[in-house]
Amino acid sequence: IIISDIHGSFYTMKKLLDEVNFNPELDKLICLGDMCDRGKNTKFVWEYFYNLQKKYSHHIVLLGNHEDMFNLAIKEARYTEQEEVRQDHYFRNSGLTTLQSFYPEATKENRRKYFKLFAQDFKALRTWLKNLPTRYEGKDYYFVHAGVDFSKGFWNQIHRDLVWMREPYLSSTEKYNKKIFHGHTPVLKEPYYDIRDNRINIDGGCVYGGKLNIVIINDEGEINIKQSKILEEDIYEDK
């Protein structure tokens, strides 16, 4: 079962997992990153995957560029007194929604205080976020958040491409021996996913009026996709 770019949409994700009868003991869940930002309930999403992996070691959670930005913003807030570059970059990508899911009183102005607090209050979660892998190789597919450089082997990629890449990956017709599942670049028109010869993009842009996708690959290797519009309780409203 594969999901990506949940962006704080916890209740939407939960609804889809229930609809496909996700069984954490028997099924393998692979999340392709971007669990945070934009939607309202990042805290619940992160904690869900953190606890899932703590209890069952066979589930896979990858680093998305939004987790990457969060990690860099926290590091900057803690270790440099003057620098704001990383925090600004993160807040331009709706980092405030994530901070507020942990600390509702957080604002752009007092964010440094709350980034520091997060590192103290949620040590285990922070360590987990820092150590998320950037890729995974399954029996039949490769998995990344954003993309790859096809001129290099799957295990010879650089961090930035795996987590941030759009082009030339998206236009490329080159392929590996296995198809790649990825998210990162929202598919904002029907069917809200994109299946190509070399890759499958499952970011349905649920926080942009699209849909959240959940992909089920059964034992025979058949692919089914369930979808949901974002539920109201996941929509972030500016306070």
What are the functions of these language-model segments?
Residues 1-48:
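N-terminal active-site segment of His-dependent metallophosphoesterases
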Residues 15-19, 44-47, 75-78, 157-158, ...:
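Short, glycine/charged-enriched secondary-structure capping and boundary segments
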Residues 27-28, 59-60, 178:
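Residue-level recognition of the N-termini of beta-strands and the immediately preceding loop/turn
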Residues 7-11, 37-40, 66-71, 150-151, ...:
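Active-site environment of divalent metal-dependent phosphoester hydrolases
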Residues 38-133, 171:
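Active-site neighborhood of divalent metal-dependent phosphoester bond hydrolases
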Residues 23, 92-201, 205-210, 217-233:
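Acidic, His/Gly-enriched loop-helix segments that form or flank divalent-metal centers
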Residues 18, 231-236:
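Hydrophobic N-terminal alpha-helices or hydrophobic patches in metabolic proteins across all domains
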Residues 4, 32-33, 63-64, 144, ...:
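Active-site flanking residues adjacent to catalytic metal/cofactor-binding acidic residues
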